[in-house]
Amino acid sequence: EEGNSQTIATLTGATDNVLYQAASYDFRLLRFRLRGYDSEYTQPTINGVTMNDAARGRFNYSMLGGLNQAFKNKSIGMGLEATAYSFGDVGGANNIATYAKDYAPGTRASVAYTNGNYYLRGMITHATGLNKHGWALTASAAVRYSDQGIVPGSFYNSASLFLSLQKVFNPQHSLSLTAFGAPTSRAANTATYQEIYDLLD
């Protein structure tokens, strides 16, 4: 079924609800569906703009790939609960805020070596904070790489970029520009049978 590869991992840390936390962290690999609803019944937004794919009706989480530090400011609405950014949906609603002034000023960098889909991940994020002229800038970059993952032939190559620029005119008015991208090239593994290989020979 289309959308099976979508998880609710972005809910981690976004709510105090115990079920959401457990489902997001413990069951994400099992493609847990909150309340049994498919991902097309959730309302994901970035800065209040609905981000569901127009053709599939689902949010493409891979476009946020590797930008954990940039997309960490989240709010969750459970079920049909109205939020500051939407009226909600039967599967819930979540908003990711990327306003540059909301990031803590400074630089944060991390490097990780893993044994999963990729074996090397590097991230760096820099935020200026809001200066006296009302400008704020946040930039982030990430790289994930593996010439071969834990399954032979499963390579992974991803580079991600994020930029948020904001001009605050007064406490009620600001203008914000956010741009991001995560071009990824990867191989996926799947279960198969010897019969398939025999048919291909």
Residue ranges and their predicted role:
Residues E2-G3:
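Low-complexity, highly charged intrinsically disordered N-terminal segments
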Residues Y37, G66, A97-K101, G129-N131, ...:
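Structural signature of outer-membrane beta-barrel channels/translocons
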Residues R33-R35, Q43-T45, S75, A93-A97, ...:
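Soluble periplasmic/extracytoplasmic beta-strand elements of cell-envelope proteins
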Residues A9-T50, G79:
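Extracytoplasmic beta-strand/coil segments of soluble accessory domains associated
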